[in-house]
């Protein structure tokens, strides 16, 4: 499965020798080894530079296409969410505040959703 995530040549490396992006991809390889129907990603681009973030987003989309899996991505990175999602849900105060297609989020008139997207939401 390392080949599916672009790491065919790292099987002999120790974890300390891997970059942050490589470690994320090794995690994906481990997740797909059991051939799941659903993959849950928890903040897959957190801590990565823009290049590796794009690489991980592309990999998520590629795994969806090749393995025909459903992906559930938990992220605060709205650009990443737009890139990998067909549908988005915003959870606010423990409840789903809004769920729908990406285009619906970009053009929302919901104040809480708009504040989140604009980075102007006040912390509780």
For each feature predicted by the language model, list its residue ranges.
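Helical segment within the ABC ATPase nucleotide-binding domain
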Residues: 54-66
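Conserved ABC ATPase signature
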Residues: 14-18, 22
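A short, proline-enriched helix->beta-strand linker immediately N-terminal to the Walker B motif
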Residues: 33-37
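Catalytic Walker B motif of ABC-type/P-loop ATPase nucleotide-binding domains
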Residues: 39-42
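A short, surface-exposed alpha-helical micro-motif characterized by mixed small hydrophobic
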Residues: 81-83
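Conserved ABC ATPase "signature" region
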Residues: 2-9
């Amino acid at each position: 499965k390392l080949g599916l995530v672009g790491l065919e040549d790292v099987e002999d490396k120790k974890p300390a020798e891997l970059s942050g992006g490589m470690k994320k991809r090794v995690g994906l390889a481990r997740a797909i080894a059991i051939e799941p129907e659903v993959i849950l990603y928890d903040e897959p681009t957190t801590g990565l530079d823009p290049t590796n973030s794009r690489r991980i987003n592309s990999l998520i989309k590629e795994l969806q296409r090749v393995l025909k899996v459903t992906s559930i991505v938990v992220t605060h990175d709205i650009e990443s969410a737009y890139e990998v999602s067909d549908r988005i849900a915003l959870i606010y105060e423990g409840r789903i505040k809004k769920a729908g297609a990406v285009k619906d989020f970009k053009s929302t008139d919901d104040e809480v959703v708009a504040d989140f997207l604009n980075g102007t939401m006040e912390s509780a």
